[in-house]
């Protein structure tokens, strides 16, 4: 599960970077520009290349392995604790709220991944793969505005980003611990790195959602709708 988790973090790094290109477009005045001029349009074009087409099934397999193994481990731990789970015991130093709720956080994250895919993947890659329709560059910006133009949608996504933050802060360093790449010296360093990465991801994604809202509602000029 640790290997699949680290693999998914790498994909999240790519995904966050491409989404943040939309913010760069706003700063440079290239919102709505075609691929080659607009950063976000270029990123979306890259996500439709054969390299990514090959990666998508691998990513889906990685998600499946991660989810199934997480469920097996959680059920095994639940059964192993038995009545002990009701007892009051001293909490170890390494325990955290996130570590005790990884399964719940994972379910929330998974649910929103499906929700997110219904808004973006289904309207872009799915259309190109299964319907043979080319998605125009301006459409990716319009999709961003339509999705984040509603303040409630932005707030829902921010809740998702918060759950993702908690899941990543524990999952990152514990993945290295599981494969034996962590010790007393590196544990705190990996925890700090995990916190920094999770914060960077979630701040970038939150800013992207807010920028989409501001453009869609005319606060920032350049709407394509």
Predicted regions and their residues:
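Membrane-embedded alpha-helical bundles that constitute the cytochrome b-like, heme-associated redox core
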Residues: 1-225
